[in-house]
UniProtKB/Swiss-Prot annotation:
Keyword vocabulary terms for this entry: Chloroplast, Elongation factor, Plastid, Protein biosynthesis
Protein name: Elongation factor Ts, chloroplastic
A Gene Ontology cellular-component term: mitochondrion
Job description of the protein: Associates with the EF-Tu.GDP complex and induces the exchange of GDP to GTP. It remains bound to the aminoacyl-tRNA.EF-Tu.GTP complex up to the GTP hydrolysis stage on the ribosome.
Main location (coarse class): plastid
Family: Belongs to the EF-Ts family.
Keyword Protein biosynthesis recorded: yes
Gene name for this UniProt entry: tsf
PROSITE patterns in the cross-refs: EF_TS_1 (PS01126), EF_TS_2 (PS01127)
Localization, UniProt: Plastid, Chloroplast
Length: 220
């Protein structure tokens, strides 16, 4: 039986760490309500204190580029921080490089986060899913539930922050950024990115392209 975590306990942990409410709730559930263990878990994930910095203005940073081996795919990404001092830190520069290589390995990613996806795009995706042959003859209520699940999965595929980090499949890109916020002590944001494909043709001719990029990452 799952332990019920009270809102007061979640708020108390949030006040101590600055982590998000859902992150605090999940940490408390995973630790069976033990606040000390939950706090350690948040610190290990780099989530403690990250949210306290997330509202601060990030206007410095750098533009990072990555050209994949063979020159078939290129990426340009803007990663922002608060000061030029942090922008020059090797840890920040490594983060920007990792993000650029992540984008190269994720052909479906089109947005920084799900919040950037327009209502028009979401509506279009819903219409496409609702009209698929495998569900169009099902009851309306069932179609709605199936479409909702598929849309949630589709939006995650489009969002960079929701991708699993190719160097460490246990964390997302959002987790990676939060870890670096905790490490460097400044707000960090991905502002924008663009992905170029040579000739504008197929994104990838190899099924294991993500693995190919991951191998390069792991050698660095």
């Amino acid at each position: 039986m799952t332990l019920q975590i009270s809102a007061q306990n979640v708020k108390a942990l949030r006040d101590k760490t600055g982590a998000g409410m859902m992150d605090c709730k999940k940490a408390l559930e995973a630790s069976n309500g033990n606040e000390e263990k939950a706090l350690d878990s948040l610190r290990q994930k780099g989530l403690a204190s990250a949210n306290k910095k997330s509202g601060r203005t990030a206007i410095e940073g750098l533009l990072e580029s990555y050209i994949h081996t063979g020159g078939r795919i290129g990426v340009l990404v803007e990663v922002n921080c608060e000061t030029d001092f942090v922008a020059r830190r090797p840890e920040f520069q490594k983060l920007a490089k990792d993000i650029a290589m992540q984008i190269a390995a994720c052909p479906n990613v089109e947005y920084v986060s799900m919040m950037h996806i327009s209502d028009e795009t979401i509506s279009l995706e819903k219409r496409i899913e609702a009209g698929r042959d495998d569900i169009k003859d099902k009851p309306a209520e069932m179609i709605e539930k199936i479409v909702e699940g598929r849309i949630k999965k589709r939006l995650k595929e489009l969002s960079l922050l929701d991708q699993m980090f190719i160097r460490n499949q246990d964390i997302t890109i959002e987790d990676l950024i939060n870890q670096n916020i905790a490490l460097l002590g400044e707000n960090i944001k991905i502002r924008r990115f663009v992905r170029f494909i040579l000739g504008g043709g197929e994104e990838n001719t190899k099924a294991n392209f993500a693995d190919e990029v991951a191998d390069i990452l792991n050698k660095k």
